[in-house]
């Protein structure tokens, strides 16, 4: 089974893949089809042509991050509306492809700080409303109080809001490792 990986952040690391795959790197690497769009328009073209690549041999479509090139092009209100329509269409298309081909879909998003009530800032995804609309499951990742650990919070599962489910994990040379509390 293959993975289609759209690296819009230009952060895919072959070194990290080698660490995680270990001695299996020669069998793992050919299973990843990597796209590196340089613009939001190029990302759109790649997504619109993914259907030609999906088959029973594709297990995962991953986009890291789906909002980075979108964010670069944000401008005035008219341009923002146009970009929102394009992003919305991209997500609709990705969801359609994933459902029709029974393929897992993983999207990451950039985040930004938003000043909330009483001047308190909070972190939220770029294009949060569009992402929430199209996502069945949402995980929020945060640094934990212990510097070497991360925390994942399940915010939405199959359309239902969830607030109290979370886990601790560590990023190790082998990949993601569960951590006992």
What are these regions (language model features)?
Residues 7, 36, 65, 143, ...:
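Flexible glycine-/small-residue-rich
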Residues 30, 59, 136:
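Conserved acidic residues
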Residues 97-181:
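Phosphate-binding/switch region of NTP-binding enzymes
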């Amino acid at each position: 089974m293959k993975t289609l990986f759209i690296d819009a952040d230009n952060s895919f690391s072959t070194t990290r893949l080698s660490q995680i795959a270990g001695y299996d790197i020669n069998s793992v690497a050919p299973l990843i089809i990597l796209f590196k769009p340089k613009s939001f328009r190029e990302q759109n073209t790649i997504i619109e042509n993914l259907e030609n690549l999906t088959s029973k041999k594709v297990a995962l479509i991953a986009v890291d991050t789906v909002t980075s090139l979108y964010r670069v092009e944000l401008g005035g209100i008219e341009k923002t509306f146009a970009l929102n329509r394009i992003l919305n269409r991209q997500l609709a298309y990705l969801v359609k492809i994933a459902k029709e081909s029974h393929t897992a879909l993983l999207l990451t998003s950039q985040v930004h700080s938003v000043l909330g009530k009483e001047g308190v800032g909070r972190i939220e995804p770029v294009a949060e409303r569009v992402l929430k609309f199209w996502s069945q499951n949402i995980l929020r990742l945060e640094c934990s109080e212990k510097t070497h650990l991360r925390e994942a919070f399940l915010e939405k599962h199959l359309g239902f809001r969830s607030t109290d489910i979370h886990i601790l994990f560590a990023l190790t040379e082998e990949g993601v490792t569960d951590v006992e509390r």
